[in-house]
Regions:
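P-loop (Walker A) phosphate-binding loop of NTP-binding proteins
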Residues: 11
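Loop/turn-to-beta-strand initiation segments
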Residues: 74-78, 101
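Conserved lysine of the Walker
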Residues: 16
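Conserved substrate/cofactor phosphate-moiety recognition/catalytic segment
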Residues: 21-65
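Walker A (P-loop) ATP-phosphate-binding motif of ABC ATPase nucleotide-binding domains
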Residues: 5
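Hydrophobic anchor at the beta1->P-loop junction of P-loop NTPases
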Residues: 8
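Small-molecule kinase domains that catalyze NTP-dependent phosphoryl transfer to phosphate-bearing small molecules
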Residues: 118-160
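Conserved phosphate-donor/acceptor-positioning beta-strand/loop module used by diverse small-molecule
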Residues: 96-116
Length: 171
């Protein structure tokens, strides 16, 4: 079996880190939080309430792509969480990688805002949600992208994601 990278994607506050870590635990996979791969300047910019632009995101997306490549070349399974909001970002992550799958965590703005208000100590302010929703290019009809609703418990979301991933190992 070849390595496989699973990218858990969506806007801020949709539960990427929580769901991604649980998927990784369930699949006995490596977990990488994409927030940890941001250059310090990006985190400072977002913490100040300023959205990132494509120039800001470029080195971060390279790090995500390289992490996926490392996982695949080691014949491991890994879960990486990152927003991957635009198709061109997802294509950049796919570049040079043979086995990348995306889990798109999809939910209403009101549900995401509710969850953002409940979390503590995250650099991303809830005011950034509108910017991310405007930037989001929904991954409809893209290969190896599976949309999972975030309406429901963490366990039900993880179960839905794992079910679709296990059923599509060689896609």
């Amino acid at each position: 079996m070849t390595g496989r990278s699973i990218i858990v994607m969506g806007v801020c506050g949709c539960g990427k880190s929580t769901i991604g870590e649980n998927i990784a635990n369930t699949l006995n996979a490596k977990f990488i939080d994409g927030d940890d791969l941001h250059p310090k300047a990006n985190i400072q910019k977002m913490a100040s309430g300023t959205p990132l632009d494509d120039i800001d995101r470029a080195p971060w997306l390279e790090r995500i792509r390289d992490a996926a490549y490392s996982i695949e070349t080691k014949n491991e399974t890994g879960v990486i969480v990152c927003s991957a909001l635009k198709k061109k970002y997802r294509d950049q992550i796919r570049e040079g990688n043979q086995n990348v799958q995306f889990i798109f965590l999809d939910g209403s703005k009101s549900l995401i805002l509710e969850r953002m208000r409940a979390r503590q100590g995250h650099f991303m302010r809830e005011t950034m949600l509108d910017s991310q929703l405007e930037t989001l290019e929904r991954p409809e009809q893209e290969p190896s992208v599976f949309t999972i609703s975030i309406d429901g418990s963490i366990d039900s979301i993880v179960d839905a994601a794992v079910t679709v991933l296990v059923g599509n190992i060689n896609e």
